[in-house]
UniProtKB/Swiss-Prot annotation:
This is Chaperonin GroEL. The gene is groEL. Keywords: ATP-binding, Chaperone, Cytoplasm, Isomerase, Nucleotide-binding. One of its GO terms (biological process) is protein refolding. It comes from Nitrosomonas eutropha (strain DSM 101675 / C91 / Nm57). Pfam families: Cpn60_TCP1. Together with its co-chaperonin GroES, plays an essential role in assisting protein folding. The GroEL-GroES system forms a nano-cage that allows encapsulation of the non-native substrate proteins and provides a physical environment optimized to promote and accelerate protein folding. It is found in: Cytoplasm. One of its GO terms (molecular function) is unfolded protein binding. Signal peptide: none annotated.
Length: 547
């Protein structure tokens, strides 16, 4: 086991503060509409230029292990805020630094760190309650666009495209962000349910130009097993042929004689069909087949429920207005399922999301909700260079998460004003003793810090602006983008309540831990023994053996 160095008291805390300050100072320059860029070195290729706080935080690793511990603790604030709210990472970092800086002065003055921490917690609880009162629902497309714009560093185009995407697929819909091929941002919306399985044979293709099999008003057969024998399928094929409609078969697999017969019938025009594999694997496949059944008003033909292919009837089949099957995707548009049944299924999946333990499961369940409830929107980010593309894509993702958070918990005035408006409520909070009251004072000072930093990044005088905003009420604040004072909500300067709340809670949590730290343990750097190197060097003399 490697030797360790242990530091106590002030020696430990001073190293932590240095680390906190290095990371926070690098991150906070990006705050606000006039925040500066940070250039990040890459081991290969061009450097990355970003205004995204969490991207800057993730890059920072300090040489001194004790200082690095402080930096990593604040990095945790940024990451946690990004994970829960999708944005607000820079605000959280600024708040954490402010609480730690102010708190350390009180600790140095001999106050009890545990009481300071309790005071900080009381103040934050009061601020969070006040934020909830200030919050108003984010319902209109205009407000969604404004939230997106602010989060994307005042890029109105990004806000507009996110609002349009949410408009098209609903607030529950899946929105994915990927690299575009042009200079402009594009929005591609997939209506209905899409899953990542394509046709099993190219002979099913009906449009050579688009390379898709398009079925109008088809029946949809859902089966959870492999279909190889055509005799199992014949009874239902005959019923579908009599009805004069096309047929989509979704099964674990279709091969051999069954696939060959379907292809021949399709080519001859006797019965228009298409076969695709069921999406997902194992239990997820069964669940997704059930989703498709509910969406299309059909039943999954499975032995578990006492149904077999030979005895299947037309009533067991689902229906849709249109189905498009490509090489890699199948899209079911306007399924004939009962609306109430679909809503019940969505509610059931949402309960599973609440109980899900892994992020992967949660994400997959969220996708299933979106496919049933809304649709899928694809934002293709356009840019002139790869460097710009990466930076823009990160901003679009930030903006998307922020708008989701706004829809979830509502919006408050932006520009650091919401935190400033909680000061009255926080100042009424009372601690159990003098040290806890000092903890409340620490938070009161920290609540001003995001606005101060936004103003500083604009090149204006922070104290003047903070005092003027404090004199106003409600949504009155400073619009850093234009340099004007006024109603920030009317100006479109909005923050999601969830983002502001998460930033404050995460910052105070980690800052409280730092203030109550009294010892630190880190590995001593390994020293290379000079003997080994010298011995190896001596082997060079063996060259002289050749006489």
């Amino acid at each position: 086991m490697a030797a360790k160095e242990v530091r106590f008291g002030d020696a430990a805390r001073s190293a932590v503060i240095t680390g906190v300050n290095v990371l926070a100072d690098a991150v906070k320059v990006t705050l606000g509409p006039k925040g500066r860029n940070v250039v990040l070195e890459r081991s290969y290729g061009a450097p990355t230029i970003t205004k995204d706080g969490v991207s800057v935080a993730k890059e920072i690793e300090l040489k001194d292990k004790f200082e690095n511990m402080g930096a990593q603790m604040v990095k945790e604030v940024a990451s946690k805020t990004s994970d829960t709210a999708g944005d607000g990472t820079t605000t959280a970092t600024v708040l954490a630094q402010a609480i730690v800086k102010e708190g350390m002065r009180y600790v140095a003055a001999g106050m009890n760190p545990m009481d300071l921490k309790r005071g900080i917690e009381k103040a934050v609880s009061a601020a969070v309650e006040e934020l909830k009162k200030l919050s108003k629902p984010c319902s209109t497309s205009k407000e969604i666009a404004q939230v997106g714009s602010i989060s994307a560093n005042s890029d109105a185009e990004i806000g507009r495209i996110i609002a349009e995407a949410m408009d098209k697929v609903g607030k529950e819909g899946v929105i994915t962000v990927e690299d575009g091929s042009g200079l402009e941002n594009e929005l591609d919306v997939v209506e209905g349910m899409q899953f990542d399985r394509g046709y099993l044979s190219p002979y099913f293709v009906s449009s050579a130009e688009k390379q898709i099999a398009a079925l109008e008003n088809p029946f949809i057969l859902l089966h959870d097993k492999k279909i190889s024998n055509i005799r199992d399928l014949l009874p239902i094929l005959e019923q579908v042929a009599k009805a004069g409609k096309p047929l989509l078969i979704i099964a674990e697999d279709v091969d051999g004689e069954a696939l060959a017969t379907l292809v021949v019938n399709n080519i001859r025009g006797i019965l228009k069909t298409c076969a695709v594999k069921a999406p997902g694997f194992g239990d997820r496949r069964k669940a997704m087949l059930e989703d498709i059944a509910i969406l299309t008003g059909g039943t999954v033909i499975a032995e578990e429920v006492g149904l077999s292919l030979e005895k299947a009837k037309l009533e067991d089949l689902g229906q849709a207005k249109r189905v498009e099957v490509g090489k890699e995707n199948t899209t079911i548009i306007d399924g004939a399922g009962d609306t109430k049944a679909i809503e019940a299924r969505v509610t059931q999946i949402r309960k599973q999301i609440e109980e899900a333990t892994s992020d992967y499961d949660r994400e997959k369940l969220q996708e299933r909700v979106a496919k049933l409830a809304g649709g899928v929107a694809l934002i293709k980010v356009g840019a002139a260079t790869e460097m710009e593309m990466k930076e823009k894509k990160a901003r679009v993702e930030d903006a998307f998460h922020a708008t989701r958070a706004a829809v979830e918990e509502g919006i408050v005035p932006g520009g650091g004003v919401a935190l400033l408006r909680t000061i009255d409520a926080v100042s009424k909070a009372k601690g159990d003793n003098h040290d806890q009251d000092s903890g409340i004072k620490i938070v009161l000072r920290a609540l001003e810090e995001p606005l101060r930093q936004i103003v500083t990044n604009c090149g204006d005088e922070a104290s003047v602006v903070v005092n003027k905003v404090k004199e106003g009420k409600g949504n009155f604040g400073y619009n850093a983008a234009t340099g004007e004072y006024g109603d920030l909500v009317a100006m479109g300067v909005l923050d999601p309540t969830k983002v502001t709340r998460s930033a404050l809670q995460n910052a105070s949590s980690v800052a409280g831990l730092i203030l109550t730290t009294d010892a630190m343990v880190a590995e001593l750097p390994k020293e290379d023994s000079p003997g080994a190197g010298a011995g190896m060097g001596g082997m060079g003399g063996m060259g002289g053996m050749d006489m």
